[in-house]
Amino acid sequence: MKNYKCRILITGVAGFIGCHLAKKLISEENLVVGLDNINDYYSISLKKDRLKFIEAEKKKSETFRFYKVSLEDNEKLRQIFNNYNFDIVINLAAQAGVRYSLQNPSSYIKSNIVGFSNILEFCKDFNIKHLIYASSSSVYGLNST
């Protein structure tokens, strides 16, 4: 495998922030591995367009790898962590939407709690030095003004 500045895992890579971050990191000669479950909460075609946006930046087939996987899938996550010696993990994946969380709480628990717990465990097991976690503005609740 080619020498890169860093080997970086980005979860939620088909989201707005994930795709722009991936494109920037690829342009800086990093190996970026992107994960996303491509669920239908947001437009699937929009997510696919974002992946094409990332692909347009990669200069060689080795600079970006995409895996369609849910973070609660321990086996697939373990394979991915085994295949790459990540320097950095950036967790942007989450099930969005406060109203949806009330209608389908199990989806939230699987994605946002079990999935993130798996990321934490694999970061510990694979001795990842840097984990970056971004959350949603929804955690702040309603504005009082």
Task: Annotate each PLM feature.
Residues 1-145:
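N-terminal Rossmann-like NAD(P)+-binding domain of SDR-like oxidoreductases, especially those catalyzing
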